[in-house]
Amino acid sequence: MRVFVFSLSAFIFNTTEFVPVALLSDIAKSFEMESATVGLMITAYAWVVSLGSLPLMLLSAKIERKRLLLFLFALFILSHILSALAWNFWVLLLSRMGIAFAHSIFWSITASLVIRVAPRNKKQQALGLLALGSSLAMILGLPLGRIIGQILDWRSTFGVIGGVATLIMLLMWKLLPHLPSRNAGTLASVPILMKRPLLVGIYLLVIMVISGHFTTYSYIEPFIIQISQFSPDITTLMLFVFGLAGVAGSFLFGRLYAKNSRKFIAFAMVLVICPQLLLFVFKNLEWVIFLQIFLWGIGITSLTIALQMRVLQLAPDATDVASAIFSGSYNVGIGSGALFGSIVIHQLGLGYIGFVGGALGLLALFWLRFITIKFKKHKER
């Protein structure tokens, strides 16, 4: 049940992080702005997380974890109230920064906490359940957020997220035990971790592949509507399919990762890259786009969990610091990808985002090949 609480928390944090993707056109319209400009809100959020993850985690390293989580949820809820009331884009952006600060610490400590509260022989499955919560954000959170935004307005979506977060906070207060900070690491852990070349290589891989993914994914909603010219209902269904695929990705991770982590990561990357490269090619074939999005969803979920697990395996002595750097790297990728996508839209056009995102993914795949050969003798775990 305790792992379930963390899974719910992952659900609500991932829902709010990515729900602007589903509401981009509506937010842009309400503020009379272009989607590509509003999309920079995703970049700003991600960069706050990337810059804040490590220093905020270090500042909170000695705080008892349950108390810290309750504080983060309070900040999360208040920021969503401000989002729902935002009277201009800059107020909305400010509210998103509050959420980003909560996000910075939450994802820095959550993976290690889930492993701590899980039964001794169920730690990998517990991490998979955490990832399932993230996937459900794509399955239910994003489509429901879009539906609420269409029926009412986008502000209502943020209000509902704040309400659900309040319920999760109450469950957390009731169910979680006292959780002293353990193996959090200190500032001195950072140079030690940076002397582990495979770990550094994984962090760089995260930045590269996630940049490619979000170059395309940040603008998938306007792409489907404007380039593919599918209806808003089909767009919502495609976002649902993307999230549903994440469940399959979590399942694949649980079954296959332990057998050969390197091959699993490479396989997941191929599933992320190919649909992006072919997105424009098959833009008007509805069933092909559905298939591409499904495979893409499997790939990105599998890849995210696999990379996070690899980081924890390579830094068992400083899990929170390693997770904070992972979260920061991931969000550098998100922010860079959203920025690259905006530049591509302005310079080349919306139709080219898949080509550029896929090309960045290919560079990441070459980098994976390089570090695999370079550190081939590194013990497989």
Regions found by a protein language model. Give the residues of each.
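Extracytoplasmic
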Residues: 2-38, 53-56, 216-221
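Conserved MFS/SLC helix-loop-helix module at the cytosolic interface between two early adjacent transmembrane helices
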Residues: 51-90
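Helix-to-loop junctions at the C-terminal end of transmembrane segments
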Residues: 53-64, 249-261, 345
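Paired small-residue
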Residues: 79-82, 90-98, 287-295
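Helix-loop-helix hairpin linking two adjacent transmembrane segments in secondary transporters
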Residues: 91, 120-122, 129-176, 219, ...
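C-terminal transmembrane helical hairpin of 12-TM major facilitator-type secondary transporters
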Residues: 263-307
